[in-house]
UniProtKB/Swiss-Prot annotation:
GO terms for molecular function: 2 iron, 2 sulfur cluster binding; electron transfer activity; metal ion binding. Binds 1 [2Fe-2S] cluster. This is Ferredoxin. Keywords: 2Fe-2S, Electron transport, Iron, Iron-sulfur, Metal-binding, Transport. The keyword Acetylation does not apply. GO terms for biological process: electron transport chain. Pfam families: Fer2 (PF00111). The keyword Electron transport applies.
Length: 99
């Protein structure tokens, strides 16, 4: 099992934290364990409440069923069903940008 550094940022929310996240742990779960309060609703990859955008690194969100290919190509990630596959940086609270 690998552990990656996941940096979560959002200037408007005052978030700039780097957390450790195992490659078999969802990023949202690791953030909550680290004491961060990120938005979420379904926790199943079927809505957009937890959406963020990945600015560097790679993730696996194959469990999600909400985002279309264009949104994924644009860097959107559902943190509730995303595993890190490298060190990465994610901008949080990006649901509004999807619409």
């Amino acid at each position: 099992m690998a552990t990656y550094k996941v940096t979560l940022i959002n200037e408007a929310e005052g978030i700039n934290e780097t957390i450790d996240c195992d490659d078999d742990t969802y990023i949202l779960d690791a953030a909550e364990e680290a004491g961060l309060d990120l938005p979420y609703s379904c926790r199943a990859g079927a809505c957009s409440t937890c959406a963020g955008t990945i600015t560097s690194g790679t993730i696996d969100q194959s469990d999600q069923s909400f985002l279309d290919d264009d949104q994924i190509e644009a860097g959107y990630v559902l943190t509730c069903v995303a595993y890190p596959t490298s060190d990465c940086t994610i901008k949080t609270h990006q649901e509004e940008g999807l619409y």
